[in-house]
Amino acid sequence: MRVSSASSTPPPPAFAAAAWAVVLLAMLRSDVALAAAASSNDDTGLSPLMPPPPLAAPVPAAVSPAPATPPAVLSPRKLLRPQGADVVGVGFVSGSGGGGGGDGVRTRRVDDGCAGADDIAIYQGRATPLPSGVPAYTVDVMNRCAGGGGGDEECAIAGIHVRCGWFSSVSLVDPRVFRRLGHDDCLLNDGRPLLAGETVSFEYTNSFPYKLSVSVATCVVDPAAP
């Protein structure tokens, strides 16, 4: 009887292929582990990037306070004016210039008597407009001289000239009361004197009011003289 030895029998092909597959898988896993270890060693000691510190906010420059505006100084002199009227212009003290000086001119304090143009006040207000709608204005010119003991004659003021621009009126203004002689020069009361407290009034119509102010006024010693 013939007996065969088991050790001499070669392994089947499927078993050999499986064995080689196991060996290759083990080698592949070993290579992956080594690569991971090397990558971990390369990253060791590196710190993550830190963002830059925030910039400090700019400090605004100090602003010096604005100087305080001094209060306006009001004149102690009060004006006597009709109720409901607006002061448009008050004359200035006139001397020998402007075509109004000459004999009889006296520049004095108001308490002592006539002060010339400084005693003439012009009040202007609105009046009833024309039927066509053109605005109307009323003007009152008053001699405010208080007198110095010599009576109304001491406060007589004549030759009153008014700054009036290119004054004109749609309605007629009595030229004996107020008329324009030239540009910015109008004559009041035909040049005749106003006594203390006297008022001359007139009315004019235009699309806008004129700014009126006294330019020249003359104190007269004897208002009855021609």
Curated annotation (Swiss-Prot):
GO terms for biological process: anther wall tapetum cell fate specification; cell fate determination; microsporogenesis. Keywords: Differentiation, Signal. Disruption phenotype: Male-sterile phenotype due to the absence of tapetal cells in the developing anthers. Pfam families: TPD1_C. The keyword Oxidoreductase does not apply. InterPro entries: TPD1 (IPR040361). Residues 1-35 form the signal peptide. Expressed in roots, and anthers and ovules during meiosis. The keyword Cytoplasm does not apply. Involved in cell specification during anther development. Required for the differentiation of primary parietal cells into secondary parietal cells in anthers. May serve as an extracellular ligand for the MSP1 receptor kinase to limit sporocyte number in ovules. Interacts with MSP1. This is TPD1 protein homolog 1A. It comes from Oryza sativa subsp. japonica.
